[in-house]
Structure formats: C-alpha cells, structure tokens
Amino acid sequence: MQSVLVLDFGSQYTQLIARRIRELGIYSEILPYSTTPEAIREHDPKAIILSGGPTSVYGESAILPHPGIFSLGLPILGICYGLQAIANHFGGAVESSSKQEFGRAKILVDRTEGHESMLFKDIPDSDVWMSHGDKVTRMPEGFQITASSGNSEMCAIESFGPKAALKIYGLQFHPEVQHTLYGKQLLSNFLINIAGIRPDWSSKSFIEHQIEDIRQRADKGTVICGISGGVDSTVAAVLVSKAIGKQLHCVFVDNGLLRKNEARKVMEFLKPLGLNITLADSADLFLGRLKGVASPEKKRKIIGRTFIRVFEEHINEEKFLVQGTLYPDVIESQSVKGPSETIKSHHNVGGLPKRMKLKLIEPLRELFKDEVRAVGRELGIPEDILMRHPFPGPGLAVRVLGSLTRERLDILREADEIYIDELKSSGLYQQVWQAFSVLLPVQSVGVMGDKRTYENVLALRAVESTDGMTADWAHLPHDFLAKVSNRIINEVRGINRVAYDISSKPPATIEWE
C-alpha cells in the first residue's frame, strides 16, 4: 500500500491534512517534524507533506525539519509554516508580515508561459484559507512563484529549472481546510499527478492490514478487551476478534458511571456479534476510589488505573489489552506527533498506569470517528450500534462536575434519559454528532408549588461535527428545548433549572471535563 507522510510542526490543521489525503483513497500517517531521513525510508512513503505550525523559522524557538529529508528524492509539499521551512532551507528569507492574513483570501495563479504548474492544473483564481503572521520575502534560488495573494506575493512556489526534478512545492495557504475551494483538487494534483501515488487505501484495505498486524503482535498470546458498548470499543473488539478469534476475551465493566440501564442494554445488543464477554460489576470499587475527588484530571487517571486493575483480575494468561483509542484522544492527550499543546488527558491514554502488566493493542489509534464507523460497516456491525453518540471512557464521572455521589449520578441519569428519548422521538438524534446532559456543581433558587427551592442546575449539550476535532453547537428548535426543560424540571427531583450550552470547539471542548 502506497502512503504519504505528514510531518507535524504543531498546526491545528495537521490532522485535517491526513483526513483529506485519506478521502482521496491514499493512506497517510503523521510523524513528528524531527523524523530522520532513515526513519522516513523505513516507512517507504511516496511523498512528504510539511504541516503548518505556530512558531517562526527565524526565531530562537524555531522547529525545523531534518535537512536530509530534502535529499530523499521524494516529492515534498510544504503548507504555511512548511512553505517557510522550505524557503529557509534553500536560502530564501522569511520575515514577520506587517499585515497578517487570517481567514479567506483570493489567490491569483500565474499562468504565463513557462510558469504553468502541475500543482494548479484545472484550478482557477479562487478563495483560499490563510492563517499566518510570517511570509516569504526573498525567493530561494531555483524556485519560481506560481500563485500570489494581495498580501503574499510568494503565496505558492515550486522548484524549477535545474531543481525541477526535486518536485518541491510550497503553499502559504491551507488546502486541507474546506474554505479553500479547490483544496482537495490541489492535493490530488500533488499526490496523484505529481507524486504518482495510486489510490489504494479504503476501509477494506485498512481492515486487512490491521488483521495482519494484530496477528503478528498477538501471535498465540491471549488478549483482553475492555468493551463499553460504544462505537469505538465495539469496532475495536470485532476487528481484533476477526484477527485472532477465541484468543480474545472481552470484559464489560459496570463501573457505576454508566447511563441508565446501560449494562443490561449493552449486553443485549452485543450478544449477536458473537463476542466472548464477561460482565464485571465493579461499581463499588470505582465509586469508592473516586469519593471526594473533584478534579477532572484526577478522576480520569483514577478511572484509568482502576480499569486496568479490574482487567488484571479477570485475566489468566492474557498478555495484551485492546483499547478503542482514536486519533482525537491521542491528539488531545499529549503531543505525540509534534509540539501541539496538551489539552486534557484521556483515561485510555494518559490515565493508564506507567507500569501496567499488559501491552496495548490500539487498532483504531490513527482513525477519526467517521472512519471508525466506515470500518464498522465493512465488518458488518449493525447501524444502530455504529450510530450511537460518543460516550466518554470515564463515563458520567466527567458529566457530574465536582465530587461524585450516587445521588448526583442518579439525578443525571434520569435527566439524560429524558433528553435522549426526546431527541430520538423528535427525529433529531441522528442529526447531531453528540448530545448529553451535564450536572453542574451549582445550585439555584426556584419556586415549585408556591415553595422556595434551592436545587441543581443541569446543562444540555448538543454539537454537530464530523470527526470530533472541531464542533459547532447544534441549533436545536426552541420548542424542543422548552419541552425537554419542562419534562426534566417536573420529572427529575433535584433539578430546578436547565441551561443549553452554545459553545463551539474550539474554544470549548465537547465534554465539559
């Protein structure tokens, strides 16, 4: 399978680059900006893309690619900071721009004789998405301008003449962002027409590759999988089961942090999938360890450690642990690919004990949620399982803000069931990416039955997204919200006020904790 490497310099859009490449049917992988030429050769890519980034190539904190990558003989496309890194390496100049560009801009493609670029084949002058404060001010020798904007004369450059064979291209704008009208066509021109890559990546090929990899890693060893009934862990379990069959033992842990009747429902709809599942009732253990803990980070780490301990109690000779970790989990947990800032740890990444006895198998680690669902369909998993809304690994622990009690968990369960049931009966459930309720550590004054109340505040959350990396708050009908609020306040003892969260990601995250 032919592939592309994306070297990450810390851009918020790096993962979008990988997604857009995969949408073209080409496998992509993200590696740190500092990856050596030797390591790149081991991956055997057909092209390299340099991502954008938050630093300046001329600053003391500049992060630069290994100079040897430009001698590998591979086509290279630099995006934003990647363009500036190319210009810097080949002797050009990059300076702070007196007029920064953030948002839409129009580029003019140079079509004069001798300047025609394969990169801009069939691409007219059009709107692109800019996000930069620096710009190239002196062209590196052996390069030519192929497009410009009102603020960036050297908006697109490429090697030409004696250096044409290098096939090195640079763009000041972001082709991976949807606001760049011909961004996908531009990436296709680079990868297929210039690099000559054959589109051969699909859900089917991903499954075949993972099955082979899982069999090699697990060999004849036994494997344990913590399964929650959510999309991620279910797809991961079915994929691993397809690879090693009876070597896989699944454990569904009732940690006391699940939604109403979740344990029973999960066991019922997973049964037809033929998985070997054991139910572990560990609610007392989890809630005991979480007693008095208010910090969301501490909650996540305690839950991660406790999950592993529970699994270890259910293993005999198992050597591996399967997790449904996804790419957004990894990105938000730690800067594993580049200098991006850690946002929060995930219980199934940063919360794991450093000295756990089990080795990890994470077959979905490089996939986004929509790709996981596509893999699930290829595996034959029913649509009603695949289209369930994401549910966090720590469960309701991160939806009951502050310290946990059984009473507060039960209040949230009752309210959330009403919210989700109303979404489904109104035909809105599948129109949003994720919806849930959050019990706040806040109380408010109210009046019920001519009596003063001082009870809990509940927040409703619903967002629209495709991959969980960015999200917009869902504009649910006011009549619907009024109905849900009225039902919750009247039917759930302990809540006298309901609010609706209208924050997008960024700046907020989807979950509150």
UniProtKB/Swiss-Prot annotation:
Keyword Translocase: no
Keyword Ligase (UniProt): yes
Upper lineage: Bacteria, Pseudomonadati, Chlorobiota, Chlorobiia, Chlorobiales
UniProt pathway annotation: Purine metabolism; GMP biosynthesis; GMP from XMP (L-Gln route): step 1/1
Active site (record annotation): C80, H174, E176
Assembly and interaction partners: Homodimer.
Binding site for ATP: S228, G229, G230, V231, D232, S233, T234
Molecular function, one GO term: ATP binding
Domain Glutamine amidotransferase type-1: 3-200
Organism whose genome encodes this protein: Chlorobium luteolum (strain DSM 273 / BCRC 81028 / 2530)
Alphabetized UniProt keyword annotations: ATP-binding, Glutamine amidotransferase, GMP biosynthesis, Ligase, Nucleotide-binding, Purine biosynthesis
Cross-referenced Gene3D superfamilies: 3.30.300.10, 3.40.50.880, HUPs (3.40.50.620)
Cellular component per GO, a single term: cytosol
Catalysed transformations (reactions): XMP + L-glutamine + ATP + H2O = GMP + L-glutamate + AMP + diphosphate + 2 H(+)
Domain GMPS ATP-PPase: 201-388
Role: Catalyzes the synthesis of GMP from XMP.
Annotated disulfide bonds: none
Enzyme Commission number(s) from the entry: 6.3.5.2
InterPro entries per UniProt: Class_I_gatase-like, GATASE, GMP_synth_C, GMP_synth_GATase, GMP_synthase, GMPS_ATP_PPase_dom, NAD/GMP_synthase, Rossmann-like_a/b/a_fold
Name under which the protein is recorded: GMP synthase [glutamine-hydrolyzing]
Domain of life: Bacteria
HAMAP family the record matches: GMP_synthase
SUPFAM superfamilies, alphabetized: Adenine nucleotide alpha hydrolases-like, Class I glutamine amidotransferase-like, GMP synthetase C-terminal dimerisation domain
Gene: guaA
